[in-house]
């Protein structure tokens, strides 16, 4: 089991917008991710999640798990490389323990962040597999 400490910070929306903060953190030079809470039942969400300077990038190439690891603590995960994507992703998540720095954090802070490309749906929905070739399923 690999334990990672996640860090978070609450900021007042009076001084920064999520987009301005995201741009200042990434400076258009490093990859980053901005997730915004959705409007539900007429109420705006409370959280914006910004992730940047990733320790690891997980990709799906030809329906197989591909890892780009930038942190030596995660080196043992490299053995998952080449596994069928969903099996590899499950194994990866079982080997990680994400610990938050404050129990008052937003519920989503102890998580892995990212996205799945449209074609990756075929890996989750077998009925779509005939319509979308595995070689197109990348995330």
Say what each PLM segment does:
Residues 1-139:
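Signature of the chorismate-utilizing enzyme
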